[in-house]
Amino acid sequence: MAMNFVTFNQDYSYLAVGSVSPPSATSKGFRIFTTDPFAKSYETKEGNIAIIEMLFSTSLVALILSPRRLQITNTKRQSTICELTFPTTVLAVRLNRKRLVIVLEDQIYLYDIQTMKLLYTIQTSPNPNAICALSPSSDNCYLAYPLPQKAPPSSFNPPSHTPPGTTHVSPTSGEVLIFDTLKLEAINVIEAHRSPLACITLNSDGTLLATASDKGTIIRVFSVPDGHKLYQFRRGSMPSRIFSMSFNTTSTLLCVSSSTETIHLFKLSHPTSSPDTSPSSPVGRDRSLSQSSSGYSPDRGDLTGDVGSSDFPARKHNGTLMGMIRRTSQNVGSTVAAKVGGYLPKGVSEMWEPTRDFAWFKLPKPSQTSGGSGNNGPLRSVVAMSSNTPQVMVVTSDGNFYVFSIDLSKGGEGTLTKQYSVLESNDRLGYSVTDY
């Protein structure tokens, strides 16, 4: 079995895995799992699934079975509700209780999910990576996507982390357009980054937007719909591809995964609070390097890679005198920075903002026998946070489902507590490989 697509539902209570296989093989279709406890809920071996999206905990699923064909299915009744064919390849599907969104490379279709009536068609600039987010909320029913450009960029340099010999297509811009899918009108444009967007996500209430550019060093969080910047975090100093971002259900934490295979959690506390008292992460120590640069600008992380490495080995605080002095100086420095920053112009004061992650953990190295997509590239991952316990759930492209526990009071390095496989095709499907 080859895993072709993986996604969580809107409240992270279910996980869906779509698979493809050669015509001679029998392992294809899709599977749906409950996440807590982890168990198989539904399975079908029909069809090569390119995309699957669930509607909360209902039996309604949206499937892309061929590049241009959408099928809405009721898994409980084993029936097809409707089928739609589009002029070009469907790149992404988003849905909530009010709207169904179909993303093509240069168009977005909006449907009333109750009647499947086409409500609106949005013309976009080329968006081959299907960068788009729909709020799960039925009240704040906002859609976010890259702002269309009037003309394509005259020149574009691919990011340094793009593998040699590959074609890198730039998204439209670093600006995000907020569209009200109930009123069917654009309501705001958020200037998120100078570099092209790589990943965006909305929280469960539709009141917060997280963004990352293709540099992957800076993560920003804005209020929706007014577009005020509330937080600015540094993931690391070296460029990296952001694979997934997810708020927890209470919007107090933001989880980010990237090609470094380190998962970062950022705390959405009051903007004036300082997270520097939390244990240092592998990338947190790079912050002093980037902030001491005399040529610092607010978007420096978007424009160039800072000196340093984002993969220092993690280490705990030591109990020596020098260790105590170091921690004390960090706390004093953050307090002074907060006060001094208030007297500086906005563009300069941003260098003083607290940007360290609150918690982090490193994904285990994939085994040689792992299944997955068969891709020899970086280990891709999708992240979500449990609504019931302080845990982070991660699904990787090699077919593993990990559960990490985090300390909400202290932060620091998370602990791997459970590991499952989503690729087994026999009765042991979803069995616990490891239960720590």
Curated annotation (Swiss-Prot):
Residues 268-315 are annotated as: Disordered. WD repeats lie at residues 192-232, 237-276, 374-414. Keywords: Autophagy, Endosome, Membrane, Protein transport, Repeat, Transport, Vacuole, WD repeat. GO terms for biological process: autophagy of mitochondrion; glycophagy; nucleophagy; pexophagy; protein localization to phagophore assembly site; protein transport. One of its GO terms (molecular function) is phosphatidylinositol-3,5-bisphosphate binding. Gene3D superfamilies: YVTN repeat-like/Quinoprotein amine dehydrogenase (2.130.10.10). A motif (L/FRRG motif) lies at residues 233-237. Belongs to the WD repeat PROPPIN family. This is Autophagy-related protein 18.
